[in-house]
């Protein structure tokens, strides 16, 4: 099988050999009501670092207002020049004014700004700050404190978890976000030295009333009373490069399951730790995303990307290592037997949530998914990755109803822009572009290839295909495909290239990889346009940080790599994926030895989306510890928001996004939930033709009590039922809309006298003029008691 990895060009889902693949693409070719704003009073100055802005215009906008100094503002269509004599003279003038302003209060400029802002950074006392604010020529004095990423590049901000009106604040702060909940990570282990897992050592004292969920040691066991009233009991298993003392009050269990791996892999071929220590980085990334510590400063290759946090930072982690590397499988793989042993352990230990970012099959009888029925029956919410085989239809895995299958969506990108010598600008992803790179000659890779290299290989910037004499100092255009994306930039660096433009020649994802040289990744039609321009003899380009193009980024969208439905194993009678979450260019902790000594890195894949949902489930269990896994799933799905299409309009393609992008700010009070349990799952399987030997009646699979409605073959008319459970008493009005289909809900108003009461509704769908053999998307809404739950509908009309 081919592994779904950070570095593979493409991936094939396969489990015929009992091996699962980690669903990562990191380098693969992928509400609480907000109150009315109140104008705050100006805070009193405090000692610290400030930005002092002066009234004179900066170079970019200066029009010659100062006698003797000519204008530096560029003409329309021209770029700002900071190297001209007039710009240098005006900069000297500004810096002199800045020094004079600082000297008035006995301060010293630490850094000067003159191009987009006329000001300086300095350290000030409160009195100095107050004095400068009143000084002539001073526009403002602003405290230079660390700023939260508010532009949605950070999934935590995008999911509305952070901030004064965010989910964490509503829960009482980060210290309560997931408190009393244990998240199990079945993956490649973890890197215990990471700050994302740092915490106090475990003691032996019993928890007190002030902190009833404090974990503690009892002999070789680690115990923690949970929010649901149960007790988690785990172990910290010693092994290779892992003493067993690494567990703490954040990571309260760490075990390794390698029996099958060891039996299938000769000792001479093993490259991983036979212990919970992560030999790949995938598990560390996943665990820190789901429930890593809050406010961890993250830098990549010396560049700070602010602070990162796990979705449920107060939740505890239990690590179950099931994925291992070898010389024949350099990216970690999972053997079914090892995974099954780990699932057993997780159930026994008493985790509340499991994340499994590993491939499966598209059948209903996959052994891993079958084992997860037991986990779900035990009250464990299981989040799984949909797969990275998109954008084609029917490419997903984990199609069973008792797990939550997660697709990958985008957040605001770390943008970069390619500015061509002809003035055209093309925006893409530019994680490694800081400030400005160039101007420099822009060349195609083929034009700077070694004489002995094949042209097709050179187009891909394959290793040892480019010539140092030809490529040094230039920005090289490399085609996406076949060769790992980061290996392309490594080849450009090897020959002294100044930067790289990575181009998709067909529609595909653009990815925030950590490249060896400054790189902008462009999708079609921009990529081919840049490549065509690069063929000109005097082509030049500059790489710029940010978006300078007039084409805005639309987000969230479903990544092109994210696997799509319908689910083959159910004949399209169960919607999969269930939900979407951020999974593109996600920054989290990794294992340094296997990630070029980085402590943090950007990964992409449904592997990264799944732990966001696992963390969201942990938040929900923290508020509703007695809810079933399917109640949590329903709350997440029915409060989701539809993603966007490339044109910025909302998408109804539920086969790509499931119910939509998760909105944890809405999920705690969905109004109603659509719940299910083991008997429902067995009836579903019986309806699909499986012999369960459970003595349950078979149901039409479309009648399974899911928070979605899917009919893979609608011939004429069909009625399905859904049983609603009230989270909040009240009257709920139903509305339904399915284009080309006459749709009704009976009763149209559902009255609940108390929370916990259940009522059944019938939804009848009759084809009117819907096209045949094509999925039609609609929705049912249940609105009442100040809430609204939306249930996605997917039907395919057939003649017979």
What are these regions (language model features)?
Residues 177, 193, 278, 319-408, ...:
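Substrate-binding/access-modulating region of protease and related hydrolase catalytic domains
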Residues 337, 341, 347, 358, ...:
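Secreted peptidase-domain scaffold signal
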């Amino acid at each position: 099988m081919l592994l779904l990895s950070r570095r593979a060009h493409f991936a094939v889902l396969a489990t015929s050999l009992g091996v699962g693949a980690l669903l990562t693409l990191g380098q693969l070719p992928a509400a609480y009501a907000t109150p009315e704003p109140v104008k705050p009073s100006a805070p009193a100055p405090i000692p610290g670092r400030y930005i002092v802005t002066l009234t004179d215009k900066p170079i970019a906008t200066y029009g010659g207002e100062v006698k003797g100094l000519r204008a530096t503002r560029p003409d329309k269509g021209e770029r700002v020049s900071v190297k001209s004599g007039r710009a240098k003279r005006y900069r000297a003038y500004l810096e002199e004014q800045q020094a004079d302003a600082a000297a008035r209060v006995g301060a010293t400029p630490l850094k000067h700004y003159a191009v987009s802002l006329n000001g300086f950074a300095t350290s000030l006392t409160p009195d100095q700050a107050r004095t400068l604010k009143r000084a002539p020529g001073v526009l403002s004095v602003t405290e230079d404190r660390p700023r939260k990423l508010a532009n949605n590049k950070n999934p935590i901000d995008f999911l509305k978890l952070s901030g004064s009106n965010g989910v964490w604040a509503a829960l009482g702060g980060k210290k309560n976000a997931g408190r009393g909940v244990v998240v199990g990570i079945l993956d490649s282990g973890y890197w215990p030295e990471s700050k994302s897992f740092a915490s106090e050592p475990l003691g032996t004292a019993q928890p007190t009333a002030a902190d009833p969920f404090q974990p503690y040691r009892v002999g070789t066991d680690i115990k923690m009373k949970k929010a649901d009233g149960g007790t988690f009991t785990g172990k910290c298993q010693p092994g290779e490069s892992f003493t067993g003392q690494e567990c703490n009050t954040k990571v309260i269990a760490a075990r390794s399951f390698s029996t099958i791996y060891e039996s299938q892999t000769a000792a001479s071929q093993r490259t991983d730790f036979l212990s919970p220590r992560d030999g790949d980085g995938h598990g560390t990334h996943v665990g820190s995303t789901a429930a890593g510590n809050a406010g961890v400063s993250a830098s990549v290759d010396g560049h700070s990307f602010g602070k990162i946090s796990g979705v449920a930072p107060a939740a505890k982690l239990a690590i179950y290592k099931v994925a291992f590397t070898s010389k024949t499988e350099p990216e970690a793989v999972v053997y079914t037997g090892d995974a099954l042993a780990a699932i057993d352990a997780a159930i026994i230990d008493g985790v509340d949530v499991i994340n499994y970012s590993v491939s499966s099959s598209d059948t209903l009888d996959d052994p891993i998914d079958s084992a997860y029925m037991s986990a779900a029956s035990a009250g464990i919410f299981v989040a799984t990755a949909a797969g990275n085989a998109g954008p084609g239809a029917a490419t997903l895995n984990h199609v069973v109803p008792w797990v939550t299958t997660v697709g990958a969506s985008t957040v605001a990108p770390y943008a970069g822009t390619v500015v061509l010598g002809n003035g055209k600008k093309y925006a893409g992803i530019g994680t490694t572009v800081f400030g400005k790179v160039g101007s420099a000659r822009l060349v195609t890779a083929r034009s700077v290839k070694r004489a002995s290299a094949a042209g097709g290989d050179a187009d891909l910037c394959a290793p040892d295909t480019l010539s140092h004499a030809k490529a040094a100092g230039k920005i090289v255009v490399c085609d996406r495909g076949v060769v790992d994306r980061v290996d392309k930039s490594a080849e450009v660096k090897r020959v002294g290239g100044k930067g790289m433009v990575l181009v998709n020649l067909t529609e595909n994802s653009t990815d925030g990889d950590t490249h060896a040289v400054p790189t902008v990744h462009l999708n079609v039609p921009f990529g081919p346009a840049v490549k065509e321009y690069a063929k000109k003899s005097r082509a030049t380009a500059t790489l710029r940080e940010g978006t300078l193009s007039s084409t805005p980024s639309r987000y969230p969208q479903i990544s092109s790599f994210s696997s799509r439905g319908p689910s083959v194993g159910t004949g399209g009678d169960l919607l999969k994926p269930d939900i979407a979450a951020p999974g593109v260019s996600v920054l989290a902790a990794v294992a340094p030895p296997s990630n070029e000594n980085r402590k943090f890195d950007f990964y992409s894949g449904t592997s990264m989306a799944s732990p966001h949902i696992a963390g969201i489930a942990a938040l929900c269990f923290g508020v509703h510890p007695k809810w079933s896994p399917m109640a949590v799933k329903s709350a997440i799905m029915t409060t989701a928001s539809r993603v966007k299409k490339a044109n910025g309009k909302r998408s109804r393609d539920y086969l790509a996004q499931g119910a939509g992008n998760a909105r944890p700010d809405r999920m705690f009070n969905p109004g109603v939930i659509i719940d299910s349990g083991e008997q429902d799952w067995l009836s579903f399987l019986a309806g699909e033709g499986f012999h369960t030997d459970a003595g349950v009646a078979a149901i039409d699979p479309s009648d399974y009590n899911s928070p979605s409605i899917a009919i893979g073959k609608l011939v004429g008319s069909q009625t399905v039922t859904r049983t609603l459970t009230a989270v909040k008493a009240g009257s709920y009005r139903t509305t339904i809309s399915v284009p080309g289909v006459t749709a009704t809900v009976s009763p149209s108003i559902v009255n609940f006298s108390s929370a916990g009461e259940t009522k059944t509704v019938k939804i009848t769908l009759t084809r009117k003029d819907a096209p045949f053999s094509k999925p039609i998307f609609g929705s049912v809404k249940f609105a009442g008691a100040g809430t609204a739950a939306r249930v996605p509908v997917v039907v395919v009309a057939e003649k017979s």
